[in-house]
């Protein structure tokens, strides 16, 4: 935008009625700019648009999705490159954005198969009795405990889920409403009893292997179960805190079925595509191959984004979907 010099002319009134061009304030065409078109950024943008806001999403790559992408990394074959299963996408988001109408479909994941070097294998599926018999081939004791473990983790999940679904608590707040919410959480936790508190502390701090070893004895069961504690992390199964990630697999939900996981038809990229379609229908503008260089700042506040090509996009709110 290199404007050529123009002959002098009488100043025109500015849009704000103050006279000269130099006194004009920059236009703010967007209420919000979302940086990154991952599934979280797209959902945020869709809800803002649903509330009547004018929203722009800018994405560096050639497609939406972030960690929820399906790509043809080998000719003729498409893969979910990062996230590959779905379950923690909240049911009300699916309903609010009418995602099935935009192509969202999940196929239940009912079996997990683990082969071993000695030729044996462990097959766990939706039939509890069949799973029990499969585990009993390695450890009759673990076969009996397996159901109890699932029930206990399910109970922990039901208690923790409301805290996850709400805003993160701020222990330093002076807001009376926030203090009241913290008090309710504290009362809720305290009311569960000492055994629950001890179990919860262990789950939050222990490694997946150590936590599972308190329940089970055979490595053929502990090994495949512990892998669930490192999905989405850069940790190992013996890293502290991975037992909490394991809990997520007992908090899943598909079509009202608790503790369920599924494979998205078309790969996880199909989920992002469905959310993007819903967002566009609500009026969200999505620009691909539009990398952001930095935030535009004024008096310590973000006023927009500056693209790598030098263009500046102003907005009242800037939301980062970067990780």
Indicate residue ranges for each PLM-predicted region.
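Extreme N-terminal leader/targeting segments of oxidoreductases
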Residues: 1-33, 50-51
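Core beta-strand elements of the Rossmann-like FAD/NAD(P) dinucleotide-binding domain
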Residues: 27-30, 307-317, 321
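N-terminal glycine-rich phosphate/pyrophosphate-binding loop and immediately adjacent elements
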Residues: 25-172
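Active-site/ligand-binding neighborhood in enzyme catalytic cores
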Residues: 154-282
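A conserved beta-strand/loop element that lines the FAD pocket in flavoprotein oxidoreductases
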Residues: 278-292
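A conserved short coil-to-beta-strand element within the FAD-binding core of flavoproteins
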Residues: 288-303
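Conserved SAM/SAH-binding loop
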Residues: 39, 289-293, 309
């Amino acid at each position: 935008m290199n404007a050529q010099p123009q002959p002098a002319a009488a100043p025109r009134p500015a849009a704000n009625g103050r006279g000269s061009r130099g006194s004009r304030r920059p236009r703010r065409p967007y209420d919000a700019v979302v940086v990154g078109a991952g599934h979280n950024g797209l959902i945020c943008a869709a809800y803002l648009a649903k509330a009547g806001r004018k929203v722009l999403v800018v994405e560096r790559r050639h497609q939406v999705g972030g960690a929820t992408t399906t790509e043809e990394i080998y000719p003729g074959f498409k893969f979910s490159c990062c996230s590959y299963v779905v379950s923690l996408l909240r049911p009300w988001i699916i309903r609010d954005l009418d995602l099935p109408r935009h192509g969202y479909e999940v196929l239940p994941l009912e079996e997990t198969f683990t082969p071993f070097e000695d030729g044996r294998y462990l097959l766990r599926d939706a039939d509890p009795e069949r799973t029990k018999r499969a585990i009993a081939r390695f450890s009759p004791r673990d076969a009996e405990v397996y159901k109890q473990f699932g029930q206990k983790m399910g109970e922990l999940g039901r208690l923790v889920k409301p805290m996850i679904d709400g805003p993160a608590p701020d222990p330093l707040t002076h807001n009376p409403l926030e203090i009241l919410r913290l008090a309710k959480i504290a009362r809720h936790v305290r009311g569960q009893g000492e055994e629950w508190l001890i179990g919860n502390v262990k789950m939050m701090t222990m490694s997946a292997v150590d936590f599972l070893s308190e329940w089970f004895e055979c490595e053929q069961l502990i090994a495949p179960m512990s892998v669930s504690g490192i999905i989405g992390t850069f940790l190992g199964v013996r890293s502290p805190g991975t037992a909490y990630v394991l809990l997520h697999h007992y908090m899943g939900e598909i079509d009202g079925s608790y503790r369920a996981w599924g494979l998205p038809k078309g790969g996880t990229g199909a989920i992002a595509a469905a959310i993007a379609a819903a967002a566009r229908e609500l009026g969200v503008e999505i620009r691909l191959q539009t990398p952001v260089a930095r935030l535009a700042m004024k008096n310590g506040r973000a006023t927009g984004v500056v693209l790598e090509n030098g263009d500046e996009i102003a907005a009242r709110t800037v939301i980062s979907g970067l990780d």
